[in-house]
Each structure stands twice: as structure tokens, then as C-alpha cells.
Amino acid sequence: MLKRLRKNHPLIYCIGAEAVFLGSLFVSSYLVVIALLLFRFNFAYADDYLLGCIQELVGIGVAVVLLRRTGKAQLLTRRGCGFFNGLLVGMYPAALLAYNLYAKLLFGLPADGTLLPLWRILCFFANMMLVGVAEEFLFRGVVAETLLEHFGTSRGGIWKACLLSGVLFGCAHLTNLFTSAPLGVLMQCVFATSLGVLYGAIYFRTGNLWVTVFLHGGMDVLSMLVGGLYGTETVAESVSGYDITMLSSVLVYL
């Protein structure tokens, strides 16, 4: 059934896959909260990033099931041009990651801040990298691959697949309207769309999902590095802080 839907109605399949993926994240978060309430857990000791890890593991499971049910599980192990050669293809975003890390470590860390406990820092890194795994499996492995097969591998077909998969990736961030300021979420959606187009192009060129997983996870780590190390802000607060000036960063990726 999923194979037929993917072949005959690829856009409906992609939108449906995204809806199921996002729905699974919401449902899993509520189930975790309900379970903690049943066990009378003290939420003062809860860690958002640990809960986020559980969510993303569910999302990874959904993406893997979709790939397996449509006969595309081999994408998870396809080497393409190889991981390190793939990073050379993605050299531009990789170089930006290195520069942003340098800037964060040199200028972005609070002088009088206190590091969070090690287990919470590890949860932060794990959560951010798992976001990269889950979203790349879904938006590049499921969505972008489906659109590429539909539009074809001509120059125009690749552009259409990159642009449409990028838009779907950007729209997925509208779910943050539940927790963050509307303007910040809108800016995040625009930025995520541009990144989605870029990651799609890198994925098509390299044929290796793990290249974009690494770049995506690294970007998420750097975007929340100070908050993850020192607990100075949450993801929702960070997104709420995005403003119109963020549009200038979109030009860098285009």
C-alpha cells in the first residue's frame, strides 16, 4: 500500500509521512509525561533534552519503518561517494560549522557561567544529534528521495526535489508555534527552508545520508551550545529570540 501511494501520489505520500512523523513526536512526548505523572515523578528533576532524546528516537523509528515498508532501507547504509568525501562536497557548511564553533568558544561563552552537570550536557549533545538523525532520515531519506524519483534526475528535476523538500522541511518547524513567539518561528521556518534545500542538494550529490546527518546535527548543537552547556536558555526561548535580521543568514546558504 505504501509503495503504491509513494509511486502514484508522491506528494501526498511525502506530506503524509511528514504528518505521521510530527504526530509521533507529539504523541510520544505526551505519553512520557503521562507515564511520569503515574509514577509521581518530581518534574523539578526532569531534563528537556533527555525527554527530547526519547522523542527523536521515536521519530527515527517512524522514518526507518517508512523506508523499510517502501523498499528503501538500503539508503541508510548506502555509501555513495563516502562520508569524508561527502564532507568535501559539503565543505561550505562544514567550514561554517567550524567557524561558528570557534566563535562560540571564543566569544559566546559566559565568563561567570557554571556548567551544567555532565549527564545533562551529554543529554544535550545526544538530543541535538538525534534531531539530525531523525530529520535527515525523514526529510532527505523519505521525502527528498521520493521527490527525486518523481521529478527525475535532470537538472530541473533535482532543483524541484530540492526546493519542494526544503519547503516541507521548513513547514515542519511551524509546530514550534505551540511554544515560541510567532515571528521567531516564522524566521526559523524561512531559515530551515534554505537549509533544507542545501541539505537536499548535498544529499543528492553525495548519495550518503550520514553526511547531512552530521552537518544537520552539528548545526543544531552549535545553535544551542551555550544553553546546552550552561542552561541559560531553552530551545523555545532561543526560537522566540529570532528576528528579521535572521533573513540575512539565509543569503549565506543560498
Task: List each model region and its residues.
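C-terminal membrane module of polytopic membrane proteins
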Residues: G217-L254
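Hydrophobic alpha-helical segments embedded in the membrane of multi-pass proteins
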Residues: L186-A201
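Transmembrane alpha-helix boundary signature
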Residues: R68-A73, L97-P110
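Membrane-interface helix/loop boundary segments of multi-pass membrane proteins
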Residues: A134-L164, A201-N208
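Hydrophobic residues within alpha-helical transmembrane segments
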Residues: L50, I54, L164-C171, L186, ...
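Short, Lys/Arg-rich, polar N-terminal cytosolic tail immediately upstream
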Residues: M1-N8
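Alpha-helical transmembrane segments in multi-pass membrane proteins
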Residues: I15-R69, F83-M91, R120-C123, N127, ...
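Aromatic-anchored segments of alpha-helical transmembrane domains
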Residues: L22-Y30, A94-Y102, G166-T175, G217-L229
